[in-house]
Amino acid sequence: MAMPTIRHVRAFIVRGGGADYHDQPGGHWIDDHISTPMARYPEYRQSRQSFGINVLGTLVVEIEASDGTVGFAVTTGGEIGAFIVEKHLARFLEGQLVTDIEKMWDQMYFSTLYYGRKGVVLNTISGVDLALWDLLAKVRKEPVYQLLGGPVRDELVFYATGARPDLAKEMGFIGGKLPLQHGPAEGEAGLKQNLEKLADMRSRVGDDFWLMYDCWMSLDVPYATRLAQAAHEYGLKWIEECLPPDDYWGYAELRRNVPRGMMVSTGEHEATRWGFRMLLEMQCCDLIQPDVGWCGGITELIKISALADAHNVMVVPHGSSVYSYHFVVTRHNSPFAEFLMMAPKADEVVPMFTPLLLDEPVPVNGRMKVPDTPGFGVRLNPECALVRPYPR
């Protein structure tokens, strides 16, 4: 059959949860006292929202084909991302065949190179790319994972990220990743509290459950080394994103310093094959965690994953709900997936991008069979107020 072309590209913003999962009301574990690069300043230590972690908000990209089919995706980018989509990127999509995703990605990336490369521009390109995959899969009446080569496993298994790994174990997850609460600015007392928290959690979950620490770019090499060496007693499986994303040299040193058997992970805030090439060739980590909504989308994640596979490094994408699930189920070097516990107390399983998406699947007993609904299999919640700030 003749493939349709792209007729319209539209960009919307929405507040309150969704893809910007830090945009939560008060009392949520994700905005508690968590170590961050800004924790060196006491006034920004207690809450991540205090320094503006949620200022961007969610970006919704909607792409309509000439046959009326509509694909969409969500990511973090807000009004800045909407401006980039409407004022710059739309010209590379409208009028193109829905199949020409590689060409469209290439033109979006290289046309923004002078002000992009990473950050909100790559978030935005990622959102457009995911919407293109959703659109193409809907045109072909297939789930996205079939376009990626088909599943290599019957179901996904998950670890949980949240404040209560002990409850995650009861829910059937294979492991739990804790947010590190205290960084270098809080001295020896903070380091002691980090280790006490880990010891307490190990006593609750037993020895047969993974425990990991998410350090969210907040440490330096000496502190991260001390933390890793002391945490080894409690069976820490990996230590995550300890350093700023551009400190490839520090990551390489840290990987040499950690105890034998403990993994170093990073990549949540890295982007494109070129950024991950640095991590891989400099032997910075044992597993990479690209976020498909930030690293360049599915089109770029395919390349990143192949590069990692050639280096015998696992790919465990960061969060991103269905956009990750459809990829992970198709890759041998992605043996498990992450699930962000978005219940305020991390005490129940709720959809990761709630309330924005409908039909968003969640793990049951830590497992999930990825739905075979066309596209990514989700719908926008009509009760969420979408605003199009830059209509054309």
From Swiss-Prot:
Binds 1 Mg(2+) ion per subunit. One of its GO terms (molecular function) is magnesium ion binding. The record marks 291 as: Increases basicity of active site His. InterPro entries: Enolase-like_C_sf (IPR036849), Enolase-like_N (IPR029017), Enolase_C-like (IPR029065), L-Rhamnon_dehydrat (IPR023444), Mandel_Rmase/mucon_lact_enz_CS (IPR018110), Mandelate_racemase_C (IPR013342), Mandelate_racemase_N_dom (IPR013341), RHMD-like (IPR046945). Its EC number is 4.2.1.90. The active site is at residue 318. SUPFAM superfamilies: Enolase C-terminal domain-like, Enolase N-terminal domain-like. Its cofactor is Mg(2+). It is an enzyme of class 4 (lyase). It catalyses: L-rhamnonate = 2-dehydro-3-deoxy-L-rhamnonate + H2O. Mg(2+) binds at residues 214, 240, 268. Substrate binds at residues 22, 48, 338. Keywords: Lyase, Magnesium, Metal-binding. Pfam families: MR_MLE_C, MR_MLE_N. GO terms for biological process: amino acid catabolic process; carbohydrate catabolic process. The record marks 338 as: Transition state stabilizer. Homooctamer; tetramer of dimers. Belongs to the mandelate racemase/muconate lactonizing enzyme family. RhamD subfamily. PANTHER family: ENOLASE SUPERFAMILY, MANDELATE RACEMASE (PTHR13794), MITOCHONDRIAL ENOLASE SUPERFAMILY MEMBER 1 (PTHR13794:SF58). Catalyzes the dehydration of L-rhamnonate to 2-keto-3-deoxy-L-rhamnonate (KDR). Reaction proceeds via a syn dehydration. This is L-rhamnonate dehydratase. It comes from Paraburkholderia phytofirmans (strain DSM 17436 / LMG 22146 / PsJN). The lineage of its organism: Bacteria, Pseudomonadati, Pseudomonadota, Betaproteobacteria, Burkholderiales. The gene is rhmD.
